[in-house]
Amino acid sequence: MSFMEALKDLRSEIDSLDRELIQLFAKRLELVSQVGKVKHQHGLPIYAPEREIAMLQARRLEAEKAGISADLIEDVLRRFMRESYANENQFGFKTINSDIHKIVIVGGYGKLGGLFARYLRASGYPISILDREDWAVAESILANADVVIVSVPINLTLETIERLKPYLTENMLLADLTSVKREPLAKMLEVHTGAVLGLHPMFGADIASMAKQVVVRCDGRFPERYEWLLEQIQIWGAKIYQTNATEHDHNMTYIQALRHFSTFANGLHLSKQPINLANLLALSSPIYRLELAMIGRLFAQDAELYADIIMDKSENLAVIETLKQTYDEALTFFENNDRQGFIDAFHKVRDWFGDYSEQFLKESRQLLQQANDLKQG
């Protein structure tokens, strides 16, 4: 037998095993769907962290005993779990508050508003949408609403909340999904005498599942009246993080405004350079390709949204100005050929990150491996 024939036979066996794997995958997903039905019936969150950790630890040990890479098995299982979380959505979720007969989402045809509309419908709540062309009939849309959720662009949020004022009754819950919280929360408390809740989903509308996602909670008024909504969101798999509006907005200056500005500036700078993007990609290491992907991803989205996030408040500009100063400071190391100064600064930053440095190194290594797997050619 020639080596090509031997290779063909081995590949044929591998193909056969792959087909068996597909059947096993299908069986596992079917079992997961049954789990989803049970969770739906009993109102259990789709994400159970303790179960996930215990299962992964057990499978890693079993893999090592079998002489298989534990990381390989964990990678496969995590991909399965991600698929499983998305599949569990199709069975819907338990209705936490059966006394809620009408929820109105202002801006519910938008991306994020539409996402919450789908999840709330899947949880058994009747949903009505008030869109920008509907204000002439706002009274009828908002009549008898139990909950009103505002999900509009940042620059329209305060105006929209003000326009709702004539239609709000004390028994209603008024909430918003805006990525800034201090001014919207204050405006809701001003126009409404009933329950008020500020929410900030820390994810985009393109997620496949809310499992492991974070939703920030900023209390407004009468929290006992909206605990059911927070519990509902947790059943979807999300984690609720509680903070106050001022602290939230301060943190968002760094999490959103500074990061988005830096990404925008990097993209703007690259676009002005005498380079060919295709050539950069062909020569890229996995980490640089991932960085390029993060930059390019920004420019595939809504420019108005990012303009609003970056320009939202004066604190953002002040912090961005300090970034400019830090760039100038860092540049002096190289202008002065100050190698030791650079090394000293490097070590100071490493000390600031502390143990997170090693944690981020491990996490980024996994991301880079996945990014390299997706590389074409």
Swiss-Prot record:
Q: Where is the Prephenate/arogenate dehydrogenase domain?
A: 101-364
Q: Per the record, GO CC terms?
A: cytoplasm
Any idea where the Chorismate mutase domain is? 1-92
Under Pfam families, the record lists:
CM_2, PDH_C, PDH_N
Q: Does the keyword Oxidoreductase apply?
A: yes
Q: Which GO terms describe its molecular function?
A: chorismate mutase activity; NAD+ binding; prephenate dehydrogenase (NAD+) activity; prephenate dehydrogenase (NADP+) activity
Superkingdom of the organism of origin: Bacteria
What does the UniProt keyword field contain? Amino-acid biosynthesis, Aromatic amino acid biosynthesis, Cytoplasm, Isomerase, Multifunctional enzyme, NAD, Oxidoreductase, Tyrosine biosynthesis
Protein's UniProt keywords contain Amino-acid biosynthesis: yes
PANTHER family associated with the record: PREPHENATE DEHYDROGENASE, PREPHENATE DEHYDROGENASE [NADP(+)]
Give the record's family classification. Answer: In the C-terminal section; belongs to the prephenate/arogenate dehydrogenase family.
**What is this protein called in UniProt?**
T-protein
Q: Which source organism?
A: Haemophilus influenzae (strain ATCC 51907 / DSM 11121 / KW20 / Rd)
